[in-house]
């Protein structure tokens, strides 16, 4: 009794809680529940509803066992449900007293008082910044309005506006505070209390919102309650669209789970299976994987998912965009139906709604911001510059020179070849490196490590790095080429302005991009950004406008571009020949052969066939061209421009 009571403490005072109710926290499980000292009743449900405004709920799955109570996610108790999926929550190690909502007399007032008193007298308590930094002077309703949080799905607990209110173990709080966090992000504040009730969640939030810790922290608490033998298989499974994101999730899991001795393996394509299989055989608590590689290992029968009771689908929308839905469904079929499932996505199209309805049971839906419209982070200053292709390189150098020395900058290109060329041109003056789908995993890891450390402050990338790349303090994003659509545009610029910081995004826009003008204007206006008159003119003309640039190629001047195969790395960008191949490079996309109105030189029959790369990328190949009447080129990029005149 004493050991159990010592794990209980009072939650921070809540002025909106009706008297005489008290908030209590079980420090071992992290559960927040409520106690009435007059009637000696304890319950998980908040006595007075303070849930934020509700949206339409997700349709209930018919293919998964639906045994959750829609009002709160708890039933009166199914003793045969080990994980508490759809019942009263997981069985706590501290005893059955915390298992049932509304059960009378689970603790006495004396037990509660004595146990809670010990929480404040211990010398190892992790103290963080003052709670006022977390904004807990706001009511839950005001907090939700301020951060544009809306929820749906039955009775949903209010957000936890400070780390002190979460009831996290001291060792975990120390890890969080040492990382420099002063308060939970909005997605964390609202999703943590729901996840700790063992409920399924759909969380819709923009990139850089802190979603990784949004599911990792409740996952750590889940591991403390479920004592599985890790050698028999993982307890937590996280699916990720790209290997970059997968490795970053692993880094975060090991960083914040270090004090709790949590083990994590990462499975992704483009790397040998041997070391990954050895990690699994040693036993791990968490597996982070791309769907393709995990399916390969499942087919080899080298991993078992029968112990997985906490499943996360991170960036679910991008996994579906990449064609991973069959692999996801195959993996989920190997996971027990008695599980907790959390889905995180930046967008909410019908394809994501469908798979959410199939895989989740009576989920709570958490929305940060506007779900129905694609919106950009308002903390990012967006500058659109209408340029001819020959003007882009010199303008890029001006932007780079205008930044403070050592500022981290990402430049996005449409093709892998342009990515390499720009990196070569910029590396001597600015320190640049390229990353794209043709790089080996070792090369990519090395480039990312140099970029993170600041040794190489400029990263030139295709869209393979647009999703999931989580590097702190990125100051500037430059869209050297406009992407395939505004969705990728929003994801690209989302690399900066993360975790409450501000950022800059420069985008070079040309006549070949005019078809995106109307959508781009909506994004800019939605974020209160300036719209250049030339872009408005393009939108009015429906794609015309910059006739003087048409000699460099138009959207109708060439074809050749097609989708490439699917791969663990995500979008590989547009391929050189426009014909992607199956592998880790992802979507091949449109090519340099003119499918995008590129400035790339046309390939005649006397040279290359136009179906693959040229053998040489050096400037020598351009010396045989017609003499130029202008001044000598200052860069390889300008040499290519002059060759095409």
From Swiss-Prot:
Binding annotation for ATP: 205-212
This protein's UniProt keywords: ATP-binding, Helicase, Hydrolase, Nucleotide-binding, RNA-binding
Composition bias type Basic and acidic residues, residue spans: 77-91, 612-623
Region named Disordered: 1-22, 44-137, 532-645
Domain Helicase ATP-binding positions: 192-366
Positions with biased composition (Gly residues): 556-597
Domain called Helicase C-terminal: residue spans: 395-539
Highest taxon of source: Eukaryota
Biased composition (Low complexity): 60-72, 108-136, 598-608, 624-634
Family annotation (CDD domains): SF2_C_DEAD (cd18787), WW (cd00201)
Record field: catalytic activity: ATP + H2O = ADP + phosphate + H(+)
ATP-binding as UniProt keyword: yes
Motif (DEAD box): 314-317
EC number: 3.6.4.13
PANTHER family: ATP-DEPENDENT RNA HELICASE DBP3
Record remark on domains: The Q motif is unique to and characteristic of the DEAD box family of RNA helicases and controls ATP binding and hydrolysis.
Protein name (record): DEAD-box ATP-dependent RNA helicase 46
Organism: Arabidopsis thaliana
Phylogenetic placement of the source organism: Eukaryota, Viridiplantae, Streptophyta, Embryophyta, Tracheophyta
Gene name of this polypeptide: RH46
């Amino acid at each position: 009794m004493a050991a159990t009571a010592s794990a209980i403490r009072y939650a921070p005072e809540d002025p909106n809680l009706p008297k005489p109710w008290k908030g209590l926290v079980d420090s071992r499980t992290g559960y927040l529940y409520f106690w009435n000292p007059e009637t000696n009743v304890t319950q998980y449900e908040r006595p007075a509803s303070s849930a934020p405004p509700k949206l339409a709920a997700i349709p209930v799955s018919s293919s998964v066992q639906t045994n959750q109570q829609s009002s709160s996610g708890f039933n009166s108790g199914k003793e045969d449900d080990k994980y508490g999926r759809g019942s009263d929550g997981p069985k706590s190690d501290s005893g059955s007293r915390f298992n049932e909502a509304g059960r009378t007399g689970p603790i006495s007032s004396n037990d509660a008082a004595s146990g809670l008193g010990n929480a404040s007298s211990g010398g190892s308590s992790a103290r963080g910044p003052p709670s006022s930094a977390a904004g807990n002077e706001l009511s839950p309703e005001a907090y939700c309005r301020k951060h544009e949080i809306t929820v749906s799905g039955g009775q949903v607990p209010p957000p936890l506006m400070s780390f002190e209110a979460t009831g996290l173990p001291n060792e975990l709080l120390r890890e969080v505070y040492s990382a420099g966090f002063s308060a939970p992000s909005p997605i964390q504040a609202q999703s943590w209390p729901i996840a700790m009730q063992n409920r399924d969640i759909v969380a819709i939030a923009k990139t850089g919102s802190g979603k990784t810790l949004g599911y990792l922290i409740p996952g750590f608490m889940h591991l403390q309650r479920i004592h599985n033998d890790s050698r028999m298989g993982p307890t937590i499974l996280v699916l990720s669209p790209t290997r970059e994101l997968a490795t970053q999730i692993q880094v975060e899991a090991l960083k914040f789970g270090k004090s709790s001795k949590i083990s994590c393996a990462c499975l992704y394509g483009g790397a040998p299976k041997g070391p990954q299989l050895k990690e699994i055989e040693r036993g791990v608590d968490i597996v982070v994987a791309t769907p393709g590689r995990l399916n390969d290992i499942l087919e080899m029968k080298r991993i078992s998912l029968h112990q997985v009771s906490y499943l996360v689908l991170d960036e679910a929308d991008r996994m579906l965009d990449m064609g991973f839905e069959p692999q996801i469904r195959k993996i989920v079929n190997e996971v027990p139906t008695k599980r907790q499932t959390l889905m995180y996505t930046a967008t909410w199209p019908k394809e994501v709604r469908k798979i959410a309805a199939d895989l989740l049971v009576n989920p709570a839906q958490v929305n940060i911001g506007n779900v129905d419209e694609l919106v950009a982070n308002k903390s990012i200053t967006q500058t659109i510059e209408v340029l001819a292709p020959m003007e882009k390189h010199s303008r890029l150098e001006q932007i780079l020179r205008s930044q403070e020395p050592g500022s981290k900058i990402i430049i996005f290109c449409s093709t892998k070849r342009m990515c390499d060329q720009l990196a070569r041109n910029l590396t001597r003056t600015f320190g640049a490196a390229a990353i794209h789908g043709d790089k080996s995993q070792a090369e990519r890891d090395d480039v990312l490590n140099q970029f993170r450390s600041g040794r190489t402050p400029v990263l030139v990338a295709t869209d393979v790095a647009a999703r999931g790349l989580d590097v702190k303090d990125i100051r500037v994003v430059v869209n050297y080429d406009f992407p395939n659509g505004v969705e990728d545009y929003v994801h690209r610029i989302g690399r900066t302005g993360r975790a409450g910081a501000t950022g800059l995004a420069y985008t070079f826009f040309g006549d070949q991009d005019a078809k995106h003008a109307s959508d781009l204007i909506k994004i800019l206006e939605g974020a209160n950004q300036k719209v250049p008159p030339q872009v408005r003119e393009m939108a009015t003309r429906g794609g015309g406008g910059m006739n003087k640039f048409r000699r460099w190629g138009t959207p109708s001047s060439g074809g050749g571009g097609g989708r490439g195969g699917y791969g663990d790395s995500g979008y590989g960008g547009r391929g050189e020949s426009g014909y992607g191949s199956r592998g880790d490079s992802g979507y091949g996309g449109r090519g340099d052969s003119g499918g995008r109105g590129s400035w790339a030189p046309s390939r005649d029959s006397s040279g290359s066939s136009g179906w693959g790369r040229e053998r040489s990328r050096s400037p020598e190949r351009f010396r045989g061209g017609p003499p130029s009447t202008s001044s000598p080129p200052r860069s390889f990029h300008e040499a290519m421009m002059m060759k095409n005149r």
